[in-house]
Amino acid sequence: MQVSVETTQGLGRRVTITIAADSIETAVKSELVNVAKKVRIDGFRKGKVPMNIVAQRYGASVRQDVLGDLMSRNFIDAIIKEKINPAGAPTYVPGEYKLGEDFTYSVEFEVYPEVELQGLEAIEVEKPIVEVTDADVDGMLDTLRKQQATWKEKDGAVEAEDRVTIDFTGSVDGEEFEGGKASDFVLAMGQGRMIPGFEDGIKGHKAGEEFTIDVTFPEEYHAENLKGKAAKFAINLKKVEERELPELTAEFIKRFGVEDGSVEGLRAEVRKNMERELKSAIRNRVKSQAIEGLVKANDIDVPAALIDSEIDVLRRQAAQRFGGNEKQALELPRELFEEQAKRRVVVGLLLGEVIRTNELKADEERVKGLIEEMASAYEDPKEVIEFYSKNKELMDNMRNVALEEQAVEAVLAKAKVTEKETTFNELMN
């Protein structure tokens, strides 16, 4: 076997391989012998068909199969010998084959980039220092009560957290526009659903009033014909409602899994959940800064084959989220995913190099801790932990999560990490 390697462009490589004619003939004869042992031909017992008849009937197809197998095996031998690491599936380009002559073909593919990590000491990371306070717990209890609130009609003016039922008609330069009209539209105030100024124009009015408000569409508004335009909305305020928050009764508290129904038990459960969410948020904030710094400090070439593969993954994930099928997923334009796919590939390559250079392996104690932390959010943590322990795929996924965390910590060990005190709400919102 003769092998030559050339660079085509960037990460592109072409390996040209020549297989000696006698190697081909030896492999063909060997395969014909195997075929002769299995085939049945009228007039001959199984395994007793003369080789010339076997060759006459099956020679062409056997030769084609043998060439395909030799191309694959010789390519693998070549890249091992040349210490080449292909990224993605190779493309085989066969040359012209002539019986009794050497056979030359080429294989085109991309290789993984050579990554030499740099700039880790210049990465700056700000780690939030946060404590869950009693006031934070109070705020979360209020949120839980609001989520379970009922609505009661009121006679007074609209306030910031009320709910209104309105008819409205919008116009620009005196002309109504598409999508600018609705009847019996229910709007919960304070959630930012409408364009700036719309809710402010309703506040202070009472049910039964009809009025007009002036607003301006944002420059980034999705409808081209409305961007930056001044508009008027004729409003008919039909109903105003205010929240009625439930009391912290034992019955209400038990809905959240606090069996004794006590306020103290609910506060403890809420605090535990908030601290778990806080721990995760801090970890993610620090991780995102470390990865962002790593990416900025290391500009690497990315194999197109890896980006294509990642785009396929993102397409299928998008289709699953929206209830689509695989065919629909493949029809989604690649431009929707290309930037994210490239980013994910770059991050994967860089973290992979961090793992390699630091000789990291998944810490099983960390894996156990991650599973326990995740399971604590469920009603029966022991059942979740047992389910994970019996599922190899889930365990491998969690090991990958742990290994990624260890890689990020290796980056942080060299980065400039400063601490900044902040509040729970500032971090989470």
UniProtKB/Swiss-Prot annotation:
It is found in: Cytoplasm. It is an enzyme of class 5 (isomerase). GO terms for molecular function: peptidyl-prolyl cis-trans isomerase activity; protein folding chaperone; ribosome binding. Its main location: cytoplasm. This is Trigger factor. Keywords: Cell cycle, Cell division, Chaperone, Cytoplasm, Isomerase, Rotamase. GO terms for biological process: 'de novo' cotranslational protein folding; cell division; chaperone-mediated protein folding; protein transport; protein unfolding. Its EC number is 5.2.1.8. It comes from the Bacteria. Belongs to the FKBP-type PPIase family. Tig subfamily. Coiled coil: none annotated. It comes from Escherichia coli O1:K1 / APEC. It catalyses: [protein]-peptidylproline (omega=180) = [protein]-peptidylproline (omega=0). Homodimer and monomer. In vivo most of the ribosomes are in complex with monomeric TF. Uncomplexed TF, however, is in a monomer-dimer equilibrium with approximately two thirds of TF existing in a dimeric state. Involved in protein export. Acts as a chaperone by maintaining the newly synthesized protein in an open conformation. Functions as a peptidyl-prolyl cis-trans isomerase. Residues 161-246 form the PPIase FKBP-type domain. Consists of 3 domains; the N-terminus binds the ribosome, the middle domain has PPIase activity, while the C-terminus has intrinsic chaperone activity on its own. GO terms for cellular component: cytoplasm. SUPFAM superfamilies: FKBP-like, Triger factor/SurA peptide-binding domain-like, Trigger factor ribosome-binding domain. The keyword Lipid metabolism does not apply.
